[in-house]
Amino acid sequence: MRILVEIAYQGNNFLGFQIQQNGRTVQQQFEKLLQRMHKRHVRIHPSSRTDRGVHAIQQYFHFDTELNIPMSQWQYAMNRTLPVDIYVNNVVTVDDDFHCRYDCVGKRYRYKVYQAQHRDPFQRGLKTFIPEPLDLDKMNRAAQQFIGTHDFTGFCSQKTEVESKVRTLYQSEIVKTDDGFDYIVTGSGFLYNMVRVLVAFLIEVGKGRHEVSDVPKLLESKNRKNVPFTAPAEGLYLEKIYLDENELLKDFGNDIKIHRKKSLQND
């Protein structure tokens, strides 16, 4: 039986989602829990692998089990054992051929920034602090330039190992908030550090160090040295996972292209 689990977590005290030899990760917490329940190792398969310090409002993983536990009890059994910075929101059965990575057709991230004269210790780890004034309208116009299908070689980590760095963005916008702004981006998939590099670039635009017209040229250059900065992890949230293409079409229109994964190239 294949089980799909929807979770949320606060990423400050995790070294990321993916299990590591030394260090606390989200995957480690769940596989340790499932091993106690099954008396054997049970591997989980996530929809996305967030980095150290990145939060998730909605994340999914699946696993296979032979345990005869009522579906209504899975959520309770997990939450009573998990640490306080992880919570299971829902547990359902899925078809045996369902795969969290392959069946994911889109993801939405939100990056939160607050602006003030000084740091707020209560925002630590939850939002990124920027003291300088920013031109949010100009940043939003630059953000819109990323919508569509592009090669994001120049806007991801140089450690990115996947062969194709072409991704499709359905949404890319700056939204003003009471204390700063959020950057909201939805796409077919994301490269390593791609969202944080996009944010860092848009902040440079807001400071007047880049122009809106620079975006096409930087995409064309495919040179990360032209976009050298990466925003901190602390303001980044994995906000939504699209497992249903109809939901993606409803949010962004029937004329968008749906990308189904043939390999694990997309983050």
Curated annotation (Swiss-Prot):
CDD domains with a match to the protein in the record: PseudoU_synth_EcTruA (cd02570)
Record field: catalytic activity: uridine(38/39/40) in tRNA = pseudouridine(38/39/40) in tRNA
Active-site feature positions: 51
UniProt-listed SUPFAM superfamilies: Pseudouridine synthase
Pfam families: PseudoU_synth_1
Single GO MF annotation: RNA binding
Protein name in the entry: tRNA pseudouridine synthase A
The species this protein was found in: Staphylococcus aureus (strain bovine RF122 / ET3-1)
Encoding gene per record: truA
